[in-house]
From Swiss-Prot:
Record's function text: Catalyzes the anaerobic reduction of benzoyl-CoA and 3-hydroxybenzoyl-CoA to form cyclohexa-1,5-diene-1-carbonyl-CoA and 3-hydroxycyclohexa-1,5-diene-1-carbonyl-CoA, respectively. The enzyme also reduces other benzoyl-CoA analogs with small substituents at the aromatic ring.
Cofactor(s) of this protein: iron-sulfur cluster; an oxidized flavin
Native organism taxonomy: Bacteria, Pseudomonadati, Pseudomonadota, Betaproteobacteria, Rhodocyclales
Keyword flag Isomerase: no
Entry protein name: Benzoyl-CoA reductase subunit C
Length: 386
């Protein structure tokens, strides 16, 4: 199977706002249930161990007209909650049995309450995370939070989630994280062979497919990508930062690369890479998931940094690891976490002589020429003067 065949399948999944693949998975067995989740991170291992399908919801993108969703939020709020409400009210998510709202920002917290009011018969949970990273404080708190989620899913499914089932799920998601890192690593080494639009669509597919199917898709893509013959261009190597929640249109990603930039790392859909290393399968699986969050999770604006000096360390590590020549801060309009963190990260870049530019977008942005011109000018300036 060629990379083109695989990406064609991924693009069809990306454009399908009725989530047909997830619907078909559920219809194949009447006992199956689907648990949807918003960005940035949820422990999908627990959902999987319950025999359920985790379904990532990234809003409606540029393919959904928002009609009812605008009535729920003010004009100065980002678009993803509006389009998510539209997905719900238009019955595109009527097959979903539950919805998780991770701790991202006040808007998503409020959306969880709205969802409870709009869909009273559904399982809805706001999933909180610790802001203290001591094992005996934040660790105990987060383990209790995980166990509450476990109990809620047990009640919904009518069956116990055993420790052995959790360990098996951790193992399959460890494999998924490894394969995702392999794809990102290949793109970083040879970005001319692995277009960022391909990587993006591969990751989007992983939000709607069973993890086992996604693992095979990633293996197939890696096997095909190494055989690709593509011409290396004199492009600038950049990192995208700030796009961890509301997603950019696919054309925006393509426009950045067409402007003369190779995207060598990003924070799109970081649920796939939120935990940097394997989660242990020995001992208590809930405690292992808790400790992995405390000590192995990446830094993002949606996660609390308990030490000021840690702010920007992860971004600078990305720059070094990927031999990046610049950073593009691309955040959704009105995204409080990303836009509040941006000046701090920009200061770290300036202190370390890392060039950067910034712009804002919405998931339905249509005019790409200004962004392409800005990114192209940035790439040219790095080639000429960096």
């Amino acid at each position: 199977m060629s990379t083109a065949d695989i990406i064609a399948r991924c693009e069809a999944l990306y454009e399908d706002l009725d989530f047909t693949a997830a619907r078909q998975w559920k219809e194949a067995d009447p006992s199956r249930k689907v648990i949807a989740y918003m960005p940035v991170y949820v422990p999908r291992e627990i959902i999987h161990a319950a025999g359920m399908l985790p379904l990532g919801i990234m809003g409606g993108g540029d393919g959904l007209e928002v009609i009812h969703g605008d009535a729920f939020y003010q004009s100065y709020i980002c678009r993803i909650p509006r389009s998510t409400i539209e997905l719900g009210l238009s019955k595109r998510m009527d097959f979903v049995d539950g919805m998780l709202f991770p701790s991202i920002c006040d808007v998503i917290r409020n959306l969880s309450g709205m969802w409870k009011l709009m869909f009273p018969g559904k399982y809805v949970r706001y999933f909180d995370v610790p802001q203290n990273y001591r094992d005996d404080v934040g660790g105990n708190y987060y383990t209790a939070e995980l166990n509450e989620l476990r109990e809620g899913l047990e009640h919904l499914s009518g069956r116990k989630i055993t420790d052995d089932a959790l360990r098996a799920s951790i193992k399959v998601y460890n494999e998924n994280r490894k394969l995702v890192q392999d794809v990102y690593g290949l793109r970083s080494r040879e970005p001319w062979k692995v277009p960022s639009a391909d990587v993006y669509l591969l990751m989007r597919a992983g939000l709607v497919l069973p993890v086992e199917e996604h693992n095979q898709m990633l293996k197939d893509y890696l096997a095909a990508a190494v055989k690709v013959e593509a011409q290396k261009r004199d492009n600038c190597r950049v990192i995208i930062n700030g796009s961890f929640c509301e997603q950019p249109p696919l054309n925006l990603i393509k426009s950045i690369e067409l402007s003369g930039c190779y995207i060598v790392d990003d924070d799109y859909m970081i649920v796939h890479r939120f935990l940097r290393n394997e989660v242990s399968t020995a001992g208590d699986p809930m405690q292992n998931l808790s400790l992995a969050f405390l000590h192995e999770s990446i830094s993002t604006a949606a996660k609390y940094d308990d030490k000021e000096e840690d702010k920007g360390k992860y971004l600078l590590e990305q720059v070094r690891t990927n031999a990046a020549e610049g950073v593009i801060f691309a955040a959704p309009s009105f995204c409080d976490p990303a836009l509040l963190e941006r000046p701090m990260l920009a200061d770290r870049c300036s202190e370390n002589k890392v060039p950067y530019i910034s712009f804002k977008y919405a998931e339905n942005s249509g005019q790409m020429q200004p962004i392409r011109e800005q990114a192209g000018t940035f790439a040219d300036s790095i080639k000429l003067w960096s």
